[in-house]
């Protein structure tokens, strides 16, 4: 079973449409009313149905009740702030930690200028951008896992 159907260029009907400027030159069907009126609402309602169904079948459990007289040993931020928290926790100088965090967006802004000679849109044909992306993803995952561990095991992830 094929996901994409390749056009049969030997078909006389398709060749007649292509000669008139119709057909696959314009990527098939128009967005109005086909996509905007029929397909998008079905996708939106399907997404809402999945979210409601999953929340009914498996509701999220609430944590323990808050106790103002018993503070935890280590207070952790929300999960999406773990890598940033780990940088601030490990770097000895807090000003250096903040400077490291400002270097990330600056480095991301430099990528288009570094790789301006490459005109390809395919990420596999853009080695610098792909290497920076993979390195950043691996570093973020490493820092996120390390932030969830105690400080003495956070750099080695408890492996050594």
Curated annotation (Swiss-Prot):
Keywords: Electron transport, Membrane, Photosynthesis, Thylakoid, Transmembrane, Transmembrane helix, Transport. InterPro entries: Cyt_b/b6_C, Cyt_b/b6_C_sf, Cyt_b6/f_cplx_suIV, Cytochrome_b_C_euk/bac. GO terms for cellular component: plasma membrane-derived thylakoid membrane. It is a multi-pass membrane protein. One of its GO terms (biological process) is photosynthetic electron transport chain. GO terms for molecular function: electron transporter, transferring electrons within cytochrome b6/f complex of photosystem II activity; electron transporter, transferring electrons within the cyclic electron transport pathway of photosynthesis activity; ubiquinol-cytochrome-c reductase activity. The chain crosses the membrane at residues 36-56, 95-115, 128-148. It is found in: Cellular thylakoid membrane. Disulfide bonds: none annotated. Belongs to the cytochrome b family. PetD subfamily. HAMAP family: Cytb6_f_subIV. Component of the cytochrome b6-f complex, which mediates electron transfer between photosystem II (PSII) and photosystem I (PSI), cyclic electron flow around PSI, and state transitions. The 4 large subunits of the cytochrome b6-f complex are cytochrome b6, subunit IV (17 kDa polypeptide, PetD), cytochrome f and the Rieske protein, while the 4 small subunits are PetG, PetL, PetM and PetN. The complex functions as a dimer. This is Cytochrome b6-f complex subunit 4. The lineage of its organism: Bacteria, Bacillati, Cyanobacteriota, Cyanophyceae, Synechococcales.
């Amino acid at each position: 079973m094929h996901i994409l159907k390749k056009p049969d260029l030997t078909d006389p009907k398709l060749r007649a449409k292509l000669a008139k400027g119709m057909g696959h030159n314009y990527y098939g069907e128009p967005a109005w009313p086909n996509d905007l009126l029929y397909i998008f609402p079905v996708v939106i309602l399907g997404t809402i149905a999945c979210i409601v169904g999953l929340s009914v079948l498996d509701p999220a459990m609430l944590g323990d009740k808050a106790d103002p007289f018993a503070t935890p040993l280590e207070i952790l931020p929300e999960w999406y702030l773990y890598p940033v928290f780990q940088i601030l926790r490990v770097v000895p100088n807090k000003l250096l930690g903040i400077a490291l965090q400002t270097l990330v967006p600056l480095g991301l802004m430099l990528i288009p200028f570094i790789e301006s000679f490459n005109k390809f849109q395919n990420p596999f044909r853009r080695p610098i951008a792909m290497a920076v992306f993979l390195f950043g993803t691996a570093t973020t995952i490493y820092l996120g896992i390390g932030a969830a561990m105690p400080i003495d095991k956070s750099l080695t992830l408890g492996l050594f």
